[in-house]
Amino acid sequence: MVQGVFVTGPPGVGKTTLIVKVTSRLKERGIRIVGFYTVEEREGGVRVGFRLVNVSNGEWRWLAHVNKVQGPMVGKYHVDVNSIEWGLTLLNQEGDLYVIDEVGPMEMKHPSFLRRVEDVVNSRRFLITIHVKMSNWVNSHLNLGSLIRLSYVNRDAAVDEVLNYLRTILNMA
């Protein structure tokens, strides 16, 4: 049974922007949303890190940064595994929709991350973005969610497409 929506696409195509737009519109309708999304941080036009943001209240932690001195490396970034743990604890809250942005190489540095994502996918209504490098994982879970492949061509229309899927899943009129 389909319980949610997976969104994938190349870096920079607008997966997080879609998450922010969709969750904003659902919150206006009284849907309780829990989880997190990831935003990049730039200084002087250069990406220096990523923040993990609580979708409920905007509170955030550093997911990864070029100037951190500890943590496993993904590219030029040191990943803060404690921040990933913080993000995972957000999924323990009660909600109507569980948001995870994203399932990707940085998040996979946490030893329990993928297991926790699978718990959500198997038992909750969800909206999850998937890094293109994780396509094998999402393909094995397509029986539980609809898949939107985001591109520069469809990214604006995809907001309404995702909302339509979620309205059905959430039993909204």
From Swiss-Prot:
Family according to the record: Belongs to the THEP1 NTPase family.
Function statement: Has nucleotide phosphatase activity towards ATP, GTP, CTP, TTP and UTP. May hydrolyze nucleoside diphosphates with lower efficiency.
Residue positions binding ATP: 9-16, 97-104
Catalytic activity: a ribonucleoside 5'-triphosphate + H2O = a ribonucleoside 5'-diphosphate + phosphate + H(+)
Lineage: Archaea, Thermoproteota, Thermoprotei, Thermoproteales, Thermoproteaceae
EC number(s) on file: 3.6.1.15
GO terms for MF: ATP binding; ribonucleoside triphosphate phosphatase activity
Origin superkingdom: Archaea
The name this protein goes by in its record: Nucleoside-triphosphatase THEP1
